[in-house]
Structure formats: structure tokens, C-alpha cells
């Protein structure tokens, strides 16, 4: 997890792990989770600050031959051995978007259960759901099989991008929506308290030129999901 108190350790950590033969490293921004905000003392990186910090890290990391791949949450997946990368905010490459896609394909493929047995759309939402009294099922009380067949939980994780567009005029009219696919629902809830709200991190990425900055940072490396905003 990266925050304002540890960015200077990233490159050294990455180089050490690469030298040890580690195949993959994942970096994630410590987000606005309720408990973290209570104890973080202002350490959370702002969205633009996070992007800039990660680009600085990537720029330094790829200066030398590497083997270890890097997954920077909501920023990029980087594969040094093939000199290729993908911008993670590009959920759908050109021509891939469909209204029928779930709002989060990760949620649709993985059941998240908290320590009390409550199911949530994803693990990052467990604190939010608990703090706001949101309940969509419990595996100890109702059993997993029934939760996966009908009810609030399955309705949540099967919600589609078409439903999001119908509930969110800003996203529906945005030229970047067909690429970001609405972004991350956990980030949206943290900032807007609306499961169909905007994900401001994706607005920042596309509207403030961070896609182009990533392409510039990676230079001649192959972009696995190139897009254009015609």
C-alpha cells in the first residue's frame, strides 16, 4: 500500500524484489476507507498525486532491464520482459464496450465475505457497508447457494453498465465512458455515496491528460490497449 509516508521506498523495494527473482509486484493506493481515514493523519495520496507518484516510479523502474512485472492499482500493468503495458483505467479497449457488461467484472467473479459472514460486492466495501448499515446477505444465516441465486447480493454484483448509464447522466454523456466503463464502484461509493455515481479517479485520469502522460512515460513500449478520443 502506498501513501504519503512511503513513496521513497518503492523503487528500492521493486529493485530488491526483482533481484530476488520475484515475478510480480502489486502496488495499491491506500484509499479513503473509513478506518484508514480515522488513523491516517492526512497520509492519503490525492488522486492526481498518486498518479504523478506512480509515473515517477515507473519512469525510474523501466530505465534498467527488469524481469518482474508491476501491477499498479487503477494505473497500469507493466510487463518488462515483453516491454508492454496496459493502462488499467482502460477497462474496455476500442470496440469492446457493451451495455450488458457488469459494472465490476471482478465482483461478478469473486464472492467477498467479511469476518461476520456478511457478503459485500468487494472486500474494499466491507467497512463502508458496515458503517452505513447496508446489508445484502450473510452466508452464515442464509447460506451461500441461496445468495448466489436470488436477492440483494446477486442484484448488486449483476448490475450492468447499462443500468449505470441510466442512473448517471454525467457518465452516460461522457466520451470516455466507453473506455473506463464507469470505473471502480468502491471508489465511487467512497466519494459520492452512490453505487452508480462517478469514479472521480477515472475522470481525473482521462480528463486531465494522465492517459497521455502514461503513454509518454512508457516511451516505445507496446501499449496493449491503445485508444483514441475521436
Question: Which ranges hold each PLM region?
Answer:
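Sequence contexts marking disulfide-bonded cysteines in secreted/extracellular proteins
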Residues: 93, 103-105, 181, 185, ...
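C-terminal accessory subdomain/extension
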Residues: 139, 190-199, 203
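Membrane-interface junctions of multi-pass transporters
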Residues: 126-175
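Secreted/processed peptides and extracellular or luminal domains of membrane proteins
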Residues: 110, 128, 177-180, 186, ...
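Short cysteine/histidine-rich zinc-coordinating motifs and their immediately flanking basic loops
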Residues: 183-189, 195-196, 214-218
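Short Fe-S-cluster ligation motifs
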Residues: 198-230
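Local cysteine-cluster metal-coordination motifs and their immediate loop/turn environment
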Residues: 121-124, 168-186
Amino acid at each position: 500500500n502506498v501513501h504519503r509516508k512511503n513513496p521513497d521506498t518503492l523503487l528500492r523495494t521493486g529493485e530488491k524484489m526483482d533481484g530476488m527473482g520475484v515475478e510480480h509486484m502489486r502496488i495499491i493506493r491506500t484509499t479513503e476507507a473509513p478506518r484508514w481515514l480515522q488513523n491516517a493523519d492526512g497520509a492519503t495520496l490525492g488522486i492526481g498525486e498518486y498518479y504523478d507518484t506512480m509515473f515517477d516510479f515507473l519512469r525510474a523502474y523501466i530505465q534498467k532491464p527488469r524481469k518482474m512485472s508491476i501491477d499498479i492499482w487503477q494505473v497500469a500493468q507493466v510487463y518488462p520482459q515483453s516491454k508492454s503495458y496496459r493502462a488499467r483505467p482502460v477497462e474496455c479497449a476500442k470496440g469492446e464496450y457493451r451495455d450488458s457488461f457488469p459494472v465490476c467484472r471482478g465482483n461478478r467473479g469473486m464472492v467477498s465475505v467479511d469476518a461476520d459472514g456478511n457478503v459485500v460486492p468487494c472486500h474494499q466495501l466491507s467497512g463502508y457497508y458496515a458503517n452505513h448499515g447496508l446489508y445484502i446477505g450473510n452466508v452464515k444465516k442464509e447460506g451461500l447457494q441461496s445468495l448466489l441465486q436470488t436477492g440483494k447480493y446477486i442484484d448488486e454484483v449483476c448490475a450492468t453498465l447499462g443500468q449505470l448509464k441510466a442512473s448517471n447522466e454525467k457518465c452516460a454523456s461522457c466520451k470516455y465512458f466507453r473506455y473506463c466503463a464507469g470505473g471502480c464502484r468502491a471508489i465511487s461509493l467512497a466519494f459520492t455515496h452512490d453505487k452508480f455515481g462517478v469514479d472521480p479517479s477515472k475522470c481525473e485520469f482521462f480528463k486531465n491528460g494522465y492517459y497521455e502522460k502514461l503513454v509518454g512515460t512508457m516511451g516505445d513500449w507496446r501499449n496493449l490497449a491503445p485508444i483514441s478520443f475521436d
